[in-house]
A protein has these predicted regions:
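Short, compact, well-ordered microdomains
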Residues: 72-103
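N-terminal non-globular leader segments, chiefly Sec-dependent signal peptides
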Residues: 1-81
Length: 103
């Protein structure tokens, strides 16, 4: 499934919890479309995020992001039971994703 990164916030380890990550390359990641499969999200292990395209539509098919270890995650389904939103908390960040149409 494809998801858009809608926000990246501090988890509280290196910034005030819940505030937007504006350090380093974090702002550039907002709006990027990624491929995520919740079956591959494991608590205690880093998450590998496969970028599909940048926010302007430029292909990023061969780019990856390795996060710090996942602490927890939650999903929100739509009425048909399809995952619409995913929030993944890692040791350093809280990523929020929204489902987008597959290519």
């Amino acid at each position: 499934m494809l998801y858009k990164i809608t926000s990246i916030k501090h988890s509280g380890t290196c910034g005030e919890r819940g505030t937007d990550r504006i350090d380093d390359r974090y702002p550039q990641r907002i709006g990027r479309v990624v491929k995520l499969d919740i079956d591959y999200i494991e608590i205690g292990y880093p998450l590998i995020i496969q970028y599909i395209r940048d926010s302007d539509g430029t292909s990023m098919r061969f780019s990856l992001l390795k996060t710090s270890c996942v602490k927890n995650y939650i999903t929100i389904d739509d009425l048909e039971g399809i995952i619409k939103y995913i929030t993944i908390e890692t040791e350093n960040s809280i990523f929020e994703f929204e489902r987008v149409n597959d290519e």
